[in-house]
Amino acid sequence: GTGCSSGCHRVGQQCRCG
């Protein structure tokens, strides 16, 4: 699906946390 885990944001094709 779309979106990332809570506290994370999309970076290109992946999600990044912190």
Curated annotation (Swiss-Prot):
It is found in: Secreted. Keywords: Amidation, Disulfide bond, Secreted, Toxin. The lineage of its organism: Eukaryota, Metazoa, Ecdysozoa, Arthropoda, Hexapoda. Disulfide bonds join 4-15, 8-17. One of its GO terms (cellular component) is extracellular region. The modification Glycine amide is found at residue 18. It comes from the Eukaryota. GO terms for molecular function: toxin activity. This is U1-poneritoxin-Ae1g. Belongs to the poneritoxin-Ae1 family. Its main location: secreted. Expressed by the venom gland.
